[in-house]
Amino acid sequence: MKSKSTQIMVFAGAFLSGIGLLALAAQDKDTVQDKEAVQDKYTVKVPNGLAFSEFRGYEDWQTVAVSQTEAINLLRSILGNPMMINAAREGIPGNGKPFPDGSVIAKVEWKQKKITDQAPFSVKAPDTVPDVLEAVEFMVKDSRRFPDTHGWGYGEFLYDAGSGTFKPSGTGAACGAACHNGAAKNDYVFTPYARR
């Protein structure tokens, strides 16, 4: 009798272990699908322009500076690849030199929201923080590739929070050039490197 109850316990244990393994496998599958959804952004390209895949790893770049644009309710984190950060630390463009080819800027934009219900913040003294991701924009310096736009190529990718996907905004690598003409004296870069 004892051996029969032992067999039942072994069978029950094996059965429960199998269920646990299936649950883990399903969880891993969901994680892989989540990663694939995130990685899908690297297949997006501005027609006749920059591809998101050209900027792999931008999420880990150092911060150039942050900015807030109240008129359009956006918070921005401006990031730079190592070449951009090193050039900025050397004083470019303030020293009159242009950024070197290979410099890349990523601008991550979020809608902003006010925190008013967590101490020490209140309606009278709110904290402004990122809310929904709005877009990711890029500028890349390559004089040979972009001679008609002062050496800079531009790309903007709008984020759809509902579907979790990006889509290109505009066409061609010159889509941001007209706007950046206002920053010509700073090699067409609006946001200066913030000293630390």
Which sequence ranges carry the predicted segments?
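Signal peptide cleavage region of secreted peptide precursors
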Residues: 22-28
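Bacterial N-terminal signal peptides
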Residues: 10-20
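Bacterial N-terminal signal peptides that target proteins for export
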Residues: 1-12
